[in-house]
From Swiss-Prot:
ATP binds at K206, G297, E328, G354, G355, D356, S357. It is found in: Cytoplasm. Its main location: cytoplasm. Monomer. Keywords: ATP-binding, Cytoplasm, Glycolysis, Kinase, Nucleotide-binding, Transferase. Pathway: Carbohydrate degradation; glycolysis; pyruvate from D-glyceraldehyde 3-phosphate: step 2/5. PROSITE patterns: PGLYCERATE_KINASE (PS00111). This is Phosphoglycerate kinase. Substrate binds at D23, F24, N25, R38, H61, L62, G63, K64, R122, R155. Its EC number is 2.7.2.3. It catalyses: (2R)-3-phosphoglycerate + ATP = (2R)-3-phospho-glyceroyl phosphate + ADP. One of its GO terms (biological process) is gluconeogenesis. One of its GO terms (molecular function) is ATP binding.
Amino acid sequence: MKLNKKTVEDIQVKGKKVLVRCDFNVPLKDGVITDENRLVGAMPTIKYLVNEGAKVILCSHLGKPKGEAKPELSLAPVAKRLSELLEKEVVFAADDTVVGENAKKAVAEMKDGDVVLLQNTRYRKEETKNEENFSKELASLADVFVNDAFGTAHRAHCSTVGVADFLNEAACGYLIQKELKFLGDAVETPVRPFVAILGGAKVSDKINVINNLLEKVDTLIIGGGMAYTFLKAQGYTIGKSLVEEDKVEYAKEMMDKAKAKGVKLLLPVDNVVGEEFDANTTPVTTEDANIPEGYMGLDIGPKTSALYADAVRTAKTVVWNGPMGVFEFANFAKGTIAVAEAMAEADATTIIGGGDSAAAVNQLGFGDKMTHISTGGGASLEFLEGKELPGIVALSDK
């Protein structure tokens, strides 16, 4: 996948109508935005376009309305908060059809530097199917397309891919530019030693990532629920831990592949276990990697935490995707905390691959210590798998 794409700075925007696909998929509670990170993240691109005298038309999805106009998933609260963040009015075009009379009127009345926000693109069932009619409607409002929503770059939808077919120029905003730089450099030209840390519940979610990263890394660290399938493949007892029986053979193959490639594959040497999947179950630390009958693994143990932290501290590039244990339970969060602390201390390029790891790092207050926290869980995973992301492919090459 070519990463050398036009950015907002490579295109003429003054006096032009610029349709910007943002990621405003923010959590709402009773119509109030509870986490506005994504709105703040979109500011540099929007402010640049406003300052350059573009007519800025913003669009995004919110939640999963599944092709129906659901009032609780309206972008109205987003328009209000964006107006405050930008310190200028963001006109909200409240059309259930997204590109309706309100949108057309608002766009027709725009002056250079004005900002309009369209309604939730997923109010239209065509959006997620990338159907041409809706792509054309979106494109009819604008002269140029800018995509700044990395979180949906792995989806071929009207507002991420289809619209680019009907406009002459398509560029990326600052958010996507940053994602491509950090994720791209890490995967294509990492400063070594390059360490990748994979956690989370399932091996099956990460099969292609493991396979692709074994071609690139010096050390691969595995934790979280997926580690128990690997421990079983090594011949350890795993009690009643989460395991994917149909992936045990695959785990063996990956261990062989790591050996053949000279990649260090680090797996837990001890575990923190409990009798129930419950925050209040008594935590017990095992002597070694074996998990006794009647217990389930819920976190990596202290020896493993130290082993993983050492590998991270000596790295020059670290990519992390997925927690080391059941992070939401305080008794089983220590492994995830240890890895986050080691990354914060490392003299390295440190990249968090979105999703749960990003939430964990931000909750622990280490967010500002990381080089880059990806804004897209699914998109960053597919990037690490070596897949082409349709939303990036659709942009104009430099």
